[in-house]
Every structure is written in structure tokens, then in C-alpha cells.
């Protein structure tokens, strides 16, 4: 169908629209007829592909389930055995959150006996605070409830803290108790709107009421008190307020201070003085830091997830002391290198795993470490030459960083940690025998997700047990162990206790029953204490736990245990350090090893003509050669030896030259037994010594010549110039 221009000119706009609709409908019908049969064919092929994929996936899944079925059944049998033992010995399953929340802390205040807070004992504080004191922003003292209940209150949830810490020291904002919707209040808090309200409320207090939060929010409207310097009653109870204590800069404040050591702080103006380092601190750098590190390919040479999943990054590792770990472990290369090196060399190092190593060295190891044969041998040799070779502390820091960045930590999930809680708390130690507790701990290890993680945990506990044993041996030989910095099981438990779960998303602090900041801090402290106690118990009783692991055949509970026969065997690598050339200790001072010795052939000549010196030049040369050999043998071997010229050394005077000659002759005569004749020397004429009379005469002449030189010296001190005439007149009188 075509359009006629005459009809287009004579027609209307409605006719044109109708014609357009007809053309589009006809084109659509032709397209449907054209692609009708191919679409059916494509649809049939897609359906066939989908059916094939589904059947292949289902078959592979069934095969995988069939292969992993025996491992799952063994894990379930270990778990059922654990519950049977718990029921037999009346061990109740205690959750870590429940156990920590039930602990009653003894709350003490530093100002409990102060007379200022006697009034607060009668008044009842709000429900969110049980310490009977409030701590406002910018003041370190405790303020009583009776005077500041209407003006100030501490935040009652974590959501309030972010805004509470950003406010200035002058503006005082009150956070009321949250509603019953939840302990943490709102899920999100708009800090920008609240900061805008804080800025506009001081100029127009009436506008603050209109800009309050809606009724759906859990927070009640904020109340802004008057200025900090407006009312005296507001700071009546504060010990650091300018109303009670004078200013620090005035002279009269020294006399009016209650004590010499009292120095009150000035009231903050609310203005933060910026420094140069503030402009280089960006908040987006630290956002999601642990997640970015876990997926960063520059950490440990490869992504840390690939180090535990890729078989090319794993090796079959045997612990240096086989009785401390299972026979064959499956470890990443870098972890195996660190464990092997520390187990052989660093058991006695004080503060190991506690002291942080060198940052550049640790970064070089974590960034440039690859699978063999490259690690520490090729790529990083030039780097270590510039920044220094790793020490024991650096390698221990690399091992600790690996565990910190490992997703899920050592246990993967908190259910395994909850199984170990009733075994190492104080109330259950009396009830459960040691043998049963070790067996139950070994059964808990069977619930780990992979054999690689199980190998990491076993090798780490074996290393920590070796360090604790070596520490005990060294401290037994010490008289005073109070100042010892060696690592005991308690210290190692404090370090590795929080690393049981790592930086996993299932953090136990999120399940705190209360949103109060003080309660959360106590919760985290108690949680770390329980975790440290668990690690400490595992370190102390690790040999017994290992016996139970081997007897129960725990390694066969993991489906990836077969990879130990497919990966490469561990080969230890040592940093390639270019040590300087060392000269052997027992080296004969010959002319071949020391070519410069031939220049030290003669002593300085003496201009003394006597009857005994004729024909003795050969003997003097022989004595000189023998003396130089003895001196060289007694000294440390050095690559370079200074030479002495053959020319005669000019003497200061003839008397001094004679005295030196006499001293040499006296030394030879005084100890004739110690002096041995040099071998392989043709002694035709014996050496004749000087007489004792000559020695005394030469010494007397030497003294006289020294006195003459002193008297004839032109040096005159300033004292003699000023007071010499006075002293001479005094002698004459």
C-alpha cells in the first residue's frame, strides 16, 4: 500500500493517522509469519539445553552428595557423641552471648567516696545508666544526677554515639531514652539533618521545634539547653567548670588552687584547630577495610580466598616435630613457610606474636609471595636487600596477619565456639574430667568446614604449644620471672582468642542484648576473656587433644582430605641473604694469605754505633719477622693490614733514641726464658745485651734532657703572665 500525494494533500490529519496504523499492523503480521517457525525451533532447542543442563547438574549434585555422604555421616556421628558425653556429665549447652550477658560485673566508681557525690546516692538514675554518674562531652569528671538530669544525658545506644562524638564541647545535646521498638533505636540516623538542626537552633530556638524528628522515629525531640556560659547552675556540679576553678593563665590562679598539682582544663570553644595531617585523612579509605583487603589480589600475592581453595597454592606439610601435629597437613605455602621457620628458630624470642614487626618487610612478604619456586628466592631478594631481611618478629606478624584476614577465622562460624564454651568456663572445670574434656574438644574440631582450615588450626596450636613449653623451660632457670617478656599460654590466648572467628560478618557484638555503650564494652571484654581462656586451655592440653584427634580419626571427617596426595610436598625456603666473605679463624700469617707481610721486614733503624751491632743485621731481621708473625696470629683476621715503610724513623733527640734502644735490650734480658729463638734462622752471632749500668745512665740522661726541654719550652701560661711577678716577689721576701 502506497500513499498518493494528492490524497495526502486533500486528506486530513486523522486520515494520516489511520493510514499509519494500518501500515504498522500489516508489517507486524508479516514479521510474525516470517519468524514464526524459527522461533519454535529456537524455543525447542533452548528447552532441550535447559533440560540437559538440569539433568547434568542434578546428576553431578547427586554424585557429589554420594561422595560426601560418608564424611557427613562421620561428622554427624562425632556431634552425636559430643552430645552424649555432655548429657552424661550434665554439661549444659551454653551460648556465648548468653554466658557473657549473665556475668555480673562489680561496678566501681573513682568518686564513690567523694563528698560531691553524696547527694547522688539517694537519687535513682535512669534505667539506661547504672553507674550513678554521667559523663558529658568535653569533661572527664562524673556529674551527679540531681543537677544535670534536665540538661544532659549520655547516649543510650550505638546509633547516638556517632552523633554524640561529632558535637562540639560547648553545645550540649540531650538524648532521651529510646522507645520500645528496639534497643538500638532507629536503623539509620541522618547526621546531616541533625547537624543542621544543631546549627540553626542557636540562632532561632523556635525553628528547632518545627524541625524535630517525626513520630515514627524512635528518638524523642532533642532539647537544646542555653549556652555553656549562660547559667551558673548548669556547671555547678562540674569540677572542671570555669565557675568553680580559675583560669589556668591568670597569676591569681596559682594562689587559689586547692593543690599544687591541680591544673584545670580550659573550657573548649568548640572550634577544632586543623592540622596538616587532617587534610590527608579521607574517610573513604577506611570504609569496608577488611572486605577490601580480603579481596585484594596484592595481599599475599594472590587473593586470600584462593590460597585456601586453589590446590596449586597448597602443599602437603609435615610439622618439624611430628608428635605435635597430625601426620599430613594441607596448608597454603606462605602459612607453611612461616610455621616451619618459627618452629625451628623462634621459640625463645621474647614478645613473639605480641610485638608488631617492620611494616615494609611485612608488606613486601604479603605482596610478593607466590607459589614455589619463587617465594623468597627470586622476586623478593632485591626487595629485601633494600628494606632488610625478615626477622622472627616479622615472620610471626605475617602469620598473624594471615589469620586475621582469613574469612571466618579459625572456626568459620560461632556454633563451634559455642560448643567449646561450656568446656573451659570456671563452673564446668570441676564437673568434667580432663580426659573427657579433651575428647569433647577433639570432637568439636570435626565440625570445621574444610581440612585446610583444620590443618591451619592444628599447626597453629602445635606452634603455640612449643612456644609455651620453651617459655616454661627458660623461666625455670630464671631467678626472677616477674620481668620476663617470654610468651606464656595466657599471653598467647589473649592474642589469638579474638582471631577464632576472624573478621567474619557474623560478629558476636551485633547480638548484644542491650544497646548501651557501657554494656557493649563489657560484653566485648567478657567475650574476649572467654575466647582467650578457650585458646589457653587448648594450648596447655594440646598433646592430649592431639591423641584424641588421632584416635577418633578426625581428619577423615573432611571431604577435601584427598587433596593431600595431589598437591606438592612442602619444601622449606630460607631468605636469600648475601652474607659477606668471612676469613677462617685459624689462618697462618704467611705471605700467601697476607702478601703485605713482606713489607714488615725491618724495625726502624737506630743510629747507634757500637761494637755489639756489627754483623747483627741478619739477627735483627729474623727477630722482626718472628715478632710480626706472633702479632698477626694474636690479632683478629682482617682483609687489610697497614704496612710499615723500611725507612728509618727520625728521633726527637739522640738521648731518646738511646733510651728506646736500652728499653728493648732490658726487655730481652729480663725474661730470657719466655723468648724463644725463631726457627729456620742461621744464627751465626748471638745477640749481646746492654749492661745494667748503661741502662741506668741512659735513663738518667733521658730524664735530664726532658727537664731541659721543659725549661726551654717557649710556652707560658696565662696564669704565669698575670701572677708570675707576684709569686717571684713573694719568694724574695
Swiss-Prot record:
SUPFAM superfamilies named in the record: GTPase activation domain, GAP
PROSITE patterns: RHOGAP
Comp. bias intervals (Polar residues): 116-125, 196-218, 225-240
Keyword Phosphoprotein carried by entry: yes
InterPro entries, alphabetized: Rho_GTPase_activation_prot, RhoGAP_dom
Pfam family, one: RhoGAP
Superkingdom of the source species: Eukaryota
Keywords: GTPase activation, Phosphoprotein
Domain Rho-GAP: residue ranges: 312-546
MF-aspect GO terms: GTPase activator activity; small GTPase binding
Residue span of region Disordered: 116-135, 174-256, 692-713
UniProt site positions, description: Arginine finger: 354
One Gene Ontology CC term in the entry: lateral cell cortex
Start-end of Low complexity biased regions: 179-195
Residues bearing PTM Phosphothreonine: 141
Compositionally biased tracts (Basic residues): 704-713
Keyword Methyltransferase: no
GO biological process, one term: small GTPase-mediated signal transduction
Protein name as catalogued: Probable Rho-GTPase-activating protein 6
Species the sequence originates in: Schizosaccharomyces pombe (strain 972 / ATCC 24843) (Fission yeast)
Gene: rga6
Amino acid at each position: 500500500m502506497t500513499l498518493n500525494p494528492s490524497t495526502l494533500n486533500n486528506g486530513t490529519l486523522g486520515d494520516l493517522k489511520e493510514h499509519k496504523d494500518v501500515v504498522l499492523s500489516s508489517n507486524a503480521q508479516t514479521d510474525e509469519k516470517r519468524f514464526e517457525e524459527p522461533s519454535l525451533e529456537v524455543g525447542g532447542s533452548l528447552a532441550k539445553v535447559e533440560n540437559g543442563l538440569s539433568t547434568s547438574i542434578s546428576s553431578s549434585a547427586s554424585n557429589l552428595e554420594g561422595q560426601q555422604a560418608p564424611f557427613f555421616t562421620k561428622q554427624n556421628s562425632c556431634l552425636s557423641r559430643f552430645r552424649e558425653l555432655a548429657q552424661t556429665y550434665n554439661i549444659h549447652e551454653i551460648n556465648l552471648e548468653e554466658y557473657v550477658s549473665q556475668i555480673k560485673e562489680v561496678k566501681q566508681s573513682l568518686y564513690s567516696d567523694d563528698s560531691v557525690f553524696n547527694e547522688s546516692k539517694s537519687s535513682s538514675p535512669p534505667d539506661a545508666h547504672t553507674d550513678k554518674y554521667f559523663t558529658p562531652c568535653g569533661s572527664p569528671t562524673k556529674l551527679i544526677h540531681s543537677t544535670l538530669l534536665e540538661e544532659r544525658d549520655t547516649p543510650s545506644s550505638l546509633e547516638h554515639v556517632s552523633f554524640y562524638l561529632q558535637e562540639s564541647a560547648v553545645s550540649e545535646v540531650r538524648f532521651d531514652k529510646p522507645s520500645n521498638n528496639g534497643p538500638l533505636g532507629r536503623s539509620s540516623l541522618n547526621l546531616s539533618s541533625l547537624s543542621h538542626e544543631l546549627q540553626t537552633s542557636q540562632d532561632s530556638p523556635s525553628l528547632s521545634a518545627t524541625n524535630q524528628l517525626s513520630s515514627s522515629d524512635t528518638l524523642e525531640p532533642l532539647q537544646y539547653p542555653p549556652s555553656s556560659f549562660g547559667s551558673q547552675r548548669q556547671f555547678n556540679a562540674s569540677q572542671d567548670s570555669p565557675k568553680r576553678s580559675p583560669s589556668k593563665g591568670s597569676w591569681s590562679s596559682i594562689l587559689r588552687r586547692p593543690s599544687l598539682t591541680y591544673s584545670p582544663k580550659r573550657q573548649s570553644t568548640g572550634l577544632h584547630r586543623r592540622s596538616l595531617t587532617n587534610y590527608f585523612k579521607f574517610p573513604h579509605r577506611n570504609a569496608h577495610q577488611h572486605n577490601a583487603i580480603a579481596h585484594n589480589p596484592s595481599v599475599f600475592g594472590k587473593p586470600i580466598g584462593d590460597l585456601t581453595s586453589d590446590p596449586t597454592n597448597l602443599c602437603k606439610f609435615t610439622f618439624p616435630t611430628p608428635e605435635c601435629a597430625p601426620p599430613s597437613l594441607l596448608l597454603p605455602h606462605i602459612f607453611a613457610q612461616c610455621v616451619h621457620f618459627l618452629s625451628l628458630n623462634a621459640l625463645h624470642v621474647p614478645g613473639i606474636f605480641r610485638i608488631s614487626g617492620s611494616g615494609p618487610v611485612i608488606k613486601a612478604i604479603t605482596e610478593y609471595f607466590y607459589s614455589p619456586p619463587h617465594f623468597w628466592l627470586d622476586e623478593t631478594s632485591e626487595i629485601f636487600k633494600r628494606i632488610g631481611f625478615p626477622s622472627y618478629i616479622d615472620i610471626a606478624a605475617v602469620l598473624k596477619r594471615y589469620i586475621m584476614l582469613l574469612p571466618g577465622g579459625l572456626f568459620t562460624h560461632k556454633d563451634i565456639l559455642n560448643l567449646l564454651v561450656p568446656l573451659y568456663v570456671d563452673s564446668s572445670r570441676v564437673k568434667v574430667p580432663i580426659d573427657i574434656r579433651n575428647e569433647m574438644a577433639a570432637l568439636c574440631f570435626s565440625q570445621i568446614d574444610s581440612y585446610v582450615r583444620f590443618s591451619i588450626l592444628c599447626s597453629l596450636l602445635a606452634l603455640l604449644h612449643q612456644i609455651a613449653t620453651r617459655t616454661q623451660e627458660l623461666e625455670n632457670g630464671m631467678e626472677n620471672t616477674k620481668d620476663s617478656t617470654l610468651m606464656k599460654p595466657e599471653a598467647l590466648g589473649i592474642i589469638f582468642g579474638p582471631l577464632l572467628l576472624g573478621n567474619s560478618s557474623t560478629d558476636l557484638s551485633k547480638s548484644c542484648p542491650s544497646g548501651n555503650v557501657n554494656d557493649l564494652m563489657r560484653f566485648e571484654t567478657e567475650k574476649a576473656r572467654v575466647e582467650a581462656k578457650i585458646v589457653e586451655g587448648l594450648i596447655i592440653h594440646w598433646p592430649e587433644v592431639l591423641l584424641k584427634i588421632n584416635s577418633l580419626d578426625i581428619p577423615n571427617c573432611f571431604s577435601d582430605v584427598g587433596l593431600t596426595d595431589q598437591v606438592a610436598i612442602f619444601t622449606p625456603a630460607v631468605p636469600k641473604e648475601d652474607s659477606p666473605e668471612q676469613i677462617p679463624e685459624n689462618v697462618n700469617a704467611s705471605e700467601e694469605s697476607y702478601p703485605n707481610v713482606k713489607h714488615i721486614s725491618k724495625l726502624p733503624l737506630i743510629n747507634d754505633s757500637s761494637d755489639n751491632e756489627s754483623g747483627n743485621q741478619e739477627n735483627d731481621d729474623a727477630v722482626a719477622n718472628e715478632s710480626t708473625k706472633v702479632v698477626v696470629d694474636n690479632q683478629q683476621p682482617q682483609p687489610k693490614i697497614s704496612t710499615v715503610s723500611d725507612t728509618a724513623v727520625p728521633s726527637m733527640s739522640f738521648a731518646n733514641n738511646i733510651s728506646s734502644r736500652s728499653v728493648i735490650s732490658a726487655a730481652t734480658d729480663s725474661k730470657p726464658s719466655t723468648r724463644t729463638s725463631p726457627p729456620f734462622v742461621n744464627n751465626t752471632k748471638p745477640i749481646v745485651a746492654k749492661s745494667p749500668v748503661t741502662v741506668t745512665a741512659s735513663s738518667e740522661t733521658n730524664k735530664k734532657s726532658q727537664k731541659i726541654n721543659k725549661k726551654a719550652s717557649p710556652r707560658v701560661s696565662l696564669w704565669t703572665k698575670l701572677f708570675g711577678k707576684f709569686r717571684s716577689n713573694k719568694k724574695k721576701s
